[in-house]
């Protein structure tokens, strides 16, 4: 991550990352401060925007991951370090919105094959194990590419917003 815009600009200009890029604050929510950078000329404004939404004055730059199908939204629960429940949804976006990274809807159930969902589950479990996460609820934002590689965009130790926990309860009875 970065706290210094000039350091981030230097890394971007030196080719540390391949375009397009995603710039976002490390500690924001609701996709506030998230933007896509397609050319170096857009970088400084995006970096300033991300920092303006960061409580800790820190941002990250990452390469954009092209999703296959829908972005995965979901919630989960771990007890004693084991992910015992998770439910995934299809995130829907509208490029006409002011911030196209904010989901406008979610549909259940997630429409990828069970083996892909199991791969997502295993990837989340690996992260929880590596971080020593024990007992918590989680909110997930995940992308799967055309080769079924799993990219954890965000795993936050909290319930999802936008009534996702209630929708999951109606969909699963849990």
Enumerate the predicted regions with their spans.
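Single, functionally critical "micro-switch" positions that shape active/binding sites
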Residues: 23, 153, 172
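Gly/Ser/Thr-rich active-site loops/lids in small-molecule metabolic enzymes
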Residues: 168-174
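Short glycine/serine/threonine-biased micro-segments
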Residues: 28-31, 158-159, 171
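Active-site nucleotide/adenylate-binding loops and adjacent lid/helix of ATP-dependent enzymes
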Residues: 1-60, 109-122, 126
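Phosphate-binding core of ATP-grasp and ATP-grasp-like enzymes
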Residues: 50-58, 65-110, 118-152, 156-164
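A short secondary-structure junction signal
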Residues: 33-35, 164-167
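Short polybasic/polar patches that bind polyanions
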Residues: 13, 129, 170
């Amino acid at each position: 991550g970065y706290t210094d815009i000039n350091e981030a600009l230097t890394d971007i200009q030196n080719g540390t990352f391949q375009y397009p890029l995603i710039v976002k604050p490390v500690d924001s929510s609701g996709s506030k401060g998230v933007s896509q950078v397609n050319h170096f000329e857009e970088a400084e404004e995006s970096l300033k925007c991300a920092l303006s939404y960061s409580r800790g004055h820190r941002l990250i730059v990452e390469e954009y991951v092209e999703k296959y199908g829908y972005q995965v939204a979901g919630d989960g629960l771990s007890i004693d370090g084991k992910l015992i429940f998770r439910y995934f949804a299809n995130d829907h976006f509208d490029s006409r919105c002011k911030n196209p990274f904010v989901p406008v809807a979610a549909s259940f159930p997630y429409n990828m094959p069970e083996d892909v969902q199991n791969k997502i589950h295993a990837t989340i479990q690996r992260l929880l194990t590596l971080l020593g996460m024990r007992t918590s609820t989680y909110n997930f934002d995940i992308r799967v590419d055309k080769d079924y590689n799993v990219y954890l965009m965000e795993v936050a130790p909290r319930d999802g917003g936008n009534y996702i926990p209630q929708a999951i309860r109606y969909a699963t009875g849990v």
